[in-house]
């Protein structure tokens, strides 16, 4: 058995080996639509390779993060220090979920990665398209993205001229941003309008159960638009499955999207001197524009 397979098995089954990596769901608690769309993923070689680089940080990094945290958001501080790298999906997992292993047919396909961070996940998507556009609120992260060749603009406004000039997009990804957006409902509407109506796919990752706040400098504020997630909140003690069902039923379908695939993956963050990595549970939705709903709305 390959080493990475042995390591993945240890991480999945032995809590003492590190934070548990959970890819499973209780299908009896899911809505029927989620149950039929569920794609079982697992810890693959690329995921294990990322975990292998998570050796914890130094005291100097920890001290630097603490000092910068007095003046900057956590995202900005991580960008300045070049630490806190995230991992959501491997390239093979993205290809499986999107059912795409080659660039968009005919060439010219385009990707919009909203809140792209340092571009680690963008890299998994970029091979599927010819044109990559990214947005980020953090200036240090924008610098990282542009250095990697991912055309980036510092904005939270999807009506930004640069973003709008490149639509429609064949793929739009919104990975762990919805719960940090000030106006998540408006954002979903704008994404639907920018997505190619026939071939476009919307890749959404959300930590569940749901907990929303907006980073403004060193403050964490409540969003001005609240999603109808009562019963699916972290504060409610909701399960992952119940929260996912509520998000689909109360938010995504009313926003004009149709579900294609659903999965669960660990949302990994490179750690610090306390532990090598941290993990949350991400719900992954692959969606497309619901043409019938759009016609009724118009």
Predicted features, each with a name:
Residues 160-166:
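Short conserved loop adjoining the S-adenosyl-L-methionine
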Residues 185-198:
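A short glycine-rich, Lys/Arg-flanked "PGG" loop and its adjoining helix->strand segment in the class I
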Residues 199-208:
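Conserved beta-strand signature within the Rossmann-like core of class I S-adenosyl-L-methionine
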Residues 118-160:
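Class I SAM-dependent methyltransferase SAM/SAH-binding core
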Residues 176-180:
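A short His-aromatic
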Residues 1-107, 120, 206, 214-298:
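N-terminal accessory regions of S-adenosyl-L-methionine
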Residues 173:
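A conserved beta-strand element that flanks and buttresses the S-adenosyl-L-methionine
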Residues 107-117:
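Conserved class I S-adenosyl-L-methionine
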């Amino acid at each position: 058995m390959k080493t990475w397979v042995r390591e993945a098995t240890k991480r999945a089954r032995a809590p003492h080996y590190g934070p548990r990596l959970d890819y499973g769901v209780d299908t009896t608690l899911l809505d029927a639509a989620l149950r039929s769309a569920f794609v079982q993923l697992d810890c693959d070689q690329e995921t294990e390779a990322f975990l292998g680089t998570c050796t914890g940080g130094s005291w100097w990094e920890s001290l630097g993060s603490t000092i910068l945290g007095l003046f900057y958001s956590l995202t900005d501080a991580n960008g300045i220090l070049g630490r806190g790298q995230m991992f959501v999906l491997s390239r093979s997992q993205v290809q499986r979920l999107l059912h795409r292993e080659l660039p968009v047919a005919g060439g010219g396909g385009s990707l919009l990665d909203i809140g792209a961070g340092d571009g680690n996940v963008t890299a998994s998507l970029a091979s599927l398209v010819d044109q990559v556009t990214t947005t980020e609120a953090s200036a240090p992260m924008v610098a990282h993205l542009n250095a990697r060749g991912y055309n980036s603009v510092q904005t939270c406004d999807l009506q930004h001229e640069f973003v709008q000039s490149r639509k429609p997009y064949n793929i739009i990804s919104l990975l762990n941003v919805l719960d940090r957006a000030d106006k998540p409902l408006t954002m979903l509407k704008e994404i639907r309008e920018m997505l190619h109506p026939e071939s476009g796919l919307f890749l959404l990752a959300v930590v569940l159960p749901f907990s929303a706040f907006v980073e403004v400098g060193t403050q964490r504020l409540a969003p001005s638009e609240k999603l109808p997630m009562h019963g699916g909140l972290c504060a409610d003690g909701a399960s992952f499955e119940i929260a996912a069902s509520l998000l689909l039923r109360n938010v995504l379908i009313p926003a004009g999207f149709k579900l294609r695939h659903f999965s669960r993956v660990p949302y990994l963050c490179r750690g610090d001197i306390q532990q090598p990595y941290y993990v949350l549970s991400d719900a992954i939705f692959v969606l497309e524009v619901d043409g019938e709903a759009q016609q009724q709305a118009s």
